[in-house]
C-alpha cells in the first residue's frame, strides 16, 4: 500500500498523481468475517466496479428493507474510499439501494459492508393503495368486509382485497419478494481517491462566470 505522504512528496499536485496512479496497483485489505464470504472481484479486465456477493439476507419489517451481508470488512490507506452501487442487472428487479449510493470510509470504518435494498412495491405503497381503494369502496357505498358481498373481478372491491392480500403476503413471507438471494452478486464497489480539502470562508465576492446563479434545468431539457 502506498502511503499518501509518499505520493505528496513524489508529485507536486494531486492531478499529477492521478495521471499515473493506474500504473501502480493499490492494495486494499479485505477481512472475511464469515468463511463463506467472497472477495470483491472484477468480472472483466478494465471494469470500474468490483462485484460484491451476498452471503445472507434478512428482512427488516420496520423499515421494509432487505439487508444483504457480504461478510467482509476492509481497510485502506488514508485518502481512499469506496462507493457502493447497484449492478447494471438491477434493472431486472423492482429494487433500489436505500441510500442510492453507499460510501465506505474504508480508512477508518471496520464494520461489515452491507447492501440495503427496498422494493418499489413496498409495504407502504401497498398499504397506501389499499387505503385509497377502501376509500373508493366507501364512496360507492360498497361494504369493505370480505364476507359482506361477493367480490367481482375488476371492481374497486376486488382491487382493494388484492392489495390487502399482497400486504399480508409480504408480512408473512417477505423473502418471496427479496430482489436477490444468498450467493447473488448484489452490487459493485468502486474504489476512489480523494484529496485533502480545506474549507476557506471568504468575505469577498466569488468570481463571475457565464452560468452565474442559474441552477436546476438552466441549460434546458
Where do the PLM segments sit?
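DUTPase catalytic domain/fold
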Residues: 1-221
